[in-house]
Amino acid sequence: KLWSMCRPEDIYKKPYTGLYCVGCEAFYLEKDVEDNTCPVHKKELETIEEENYFFKLSNYQDQLLELIESDKLRIFPENRKNEIVSFVKSGLEDFSISRSQERAKHWGVNVPGDDSRVMYVWFDALSSYINALGFADDEQGYTDFWAENQRRVHVIGKDIIRFHAVYWPAMLMSAGVPLPTELFVHGFFTIEGEKMSKSIGNVIQPKELVEDFGVDAVRYFLLREMPYADDGDISKDRLEIRYAELANQLGNLVSRVAAMTNKYFDGKIELPKVDWLKQDADLEDFMSHFNFKAYLDYTFEAVARANELIEKEQPFKTVKTDPEAAKKTLADACEIIRWVGTALLPIMPDSAAEILRRYSN
């Protein structure tokens, strides 16, 4: 349906010769590679010659530039937006949107009106965002979650940014379909600086990490280790360090404060009324910009403050001479822990729920 809705003048057929990577399922220009090698998979590119259908991307250069520079399509982080603006300004070339049945091994969606060709996987795959919602049959899900939704967000890896920030919006403009409103572009998890890849064989299995450390700890680790605008190098050793940090900083604080509260005040302390509006607004800003590392760093600054409070005031000592002062210290620590538990709900839902259960009023 999407193909058929595109403007007829935007799709045409011509012979094509290009450098192709099977792993990326993408063509590369000679100026974008060195030694005829795929920059992602480090394998030699194939020279492919065949007649294909092309999408006239050059028709949309000015519209795409205005769309991105005006933030009608917001791209995070800023360095990725700048990358795409530079790419569009350098001049857009029309791109292939079909493959021969032979090269596709007779697998794929046939081109409307031409059974000798199948749609190029990116035309097919990108349309899945809306087809999964019922676009092809005008279902309510498409209306609710795409056509009439105010936020249409894609979360993508940096290696496919051009497909999502340039090709996909142009296809949608041609078809008269609403565009995504935001793209969050993340880097790679790397092993010693190399992208994890099945073809290279340097893969860490998430299931094994979860079995060893639990899903909450792994989620925390991955979100805190990934720099906002770059790749994040990970290893099991790094996870063990973060896991110990989580236990020592947060786990120990939660257990220690609960134990003192139970021992000295029968587990009953009235929490102070604290205005967390600024902190909540800061967290909302981090989350709305998909800066999960900053979100967690900010949250754990509060954990550090609570630990410092306990070390400085030493309620386990002052309870003997000034129980009201000890109670206030523990109440303040309890309130910080309660706020931290709330902040961690989207990151570590099981652990956060347990914190809130223990520190509820």
Question: Which stretches of residues belong to each language-model region?
Answer:
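Structured secondary-structure scaffolds
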Residues: 37-41, 47-263, 297-299
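Short, glycine/charge-rich beta-strand/loop segments that flank catalytic centers
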Residues: 14-27, 81, 185
